């Protein structure tokens, strides 16, 4: 927790006592609480990072904004609460930033630069797929967000990649899909 700046304190919130204990034991957090309100009252944080199950994002972001905290959130896989939370952040003049890390990576910027320098239309074939038991072997994929029809189905990868693809190549003109099951 101190790799960037020794003065930074990281406080975790998780309803699962075992996860809170593990975060403290591994030195991933300086303190851990069962509820956002409890953490805010005790620690008075400067900002919040949302790194939780996608279907919980809207409520968590809303509660953090209600506590007057700037929010950085990992990719949200559903649009639940987007408009409300954006309006709340704007009304409170609080930053609400959705992760777009891939847009800033060097390799992504390199691809964008090469496409621009080429100066002609380009053809790009995008292939994505994953075998969930291999991707996340430490727990059954049916027990976390990729096992849910609203938040699974490679959304977490495609949702991260799509802004980069659009930034480098422009608007999509056509789509072809091939699907198979093993």
Label every model-predicted segment.
Residues 46-47, 123:
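Short, Asp-centered acidic motifs that coordinate Mg2+ and/or phosphate
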Residues 30-43:
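Short acidic low-complexity segments
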